[in-house]
């Protein structure tokens, strides 16, 4: 993947980070596995998968205003503060810059690796129109729409990030793997419900997240960081009890 793809996505990265702290990525954009190469093209208009895409979109749009729609809106915010709030009860431990600084930075780093670098080449190449644009509807987060219109729909970066994050946190806290896998799946599906992505975008994003997970396993800096994350999330002082957080048994 060429470095110019980073320029294309840099405004998105900056907009999502609310902390001024800089986190060094585990690899460069050029060292990402090229998603344009390994992903098939998104479904064409005459493809049965495209009919399924439309069915899934309208199924999500039909529950607009419901609790699940509101969850999709919450999932759309990939700021580190919001992701920590979502995944802390699922992993069963605190996630904040004071008690778990390595985990906090890992959340940021995985967004860059999975949400942006890993998806960039396919997004740039296909520049697929998003469903809310095609149908002239609002998404669950209208404030994101101007940015999304300029960003290819296929594959879903949010989904790649959520999948990657669930897998990495499962490495650190394997006893919470089933809960993390479920929440990671829902995080991706939220993009269809929100109206920001087609189902095939999300399906592809899940695979991109898995590919990036495999890529990270080969990088010593990631392994070193993961060891610290594992230590933080299993520190008895950072573990959540049922009394601390009623959602622990999610």
Curated annotation (Swiss-Prot):
Under which EC number(s) is this enzyme classified?
3.1.3.2
What Gene3D superfamilies does this protein's entry cite? Phosphatidic acid phosphatase type 2/haloperoxidase
Q: Pfam families annotated for this entry?
A: PAP2
Q: Does the keyword Transport apply?
A: no
What PROSITE patterns does this protein map onto? ACID_PHOSPH_CL_A (PS01157)
Its chief place of residence is: periplasm
Name of the protein in question: Non-specific acid phosphatase
Q: Which gene encodes it?
A: phoN
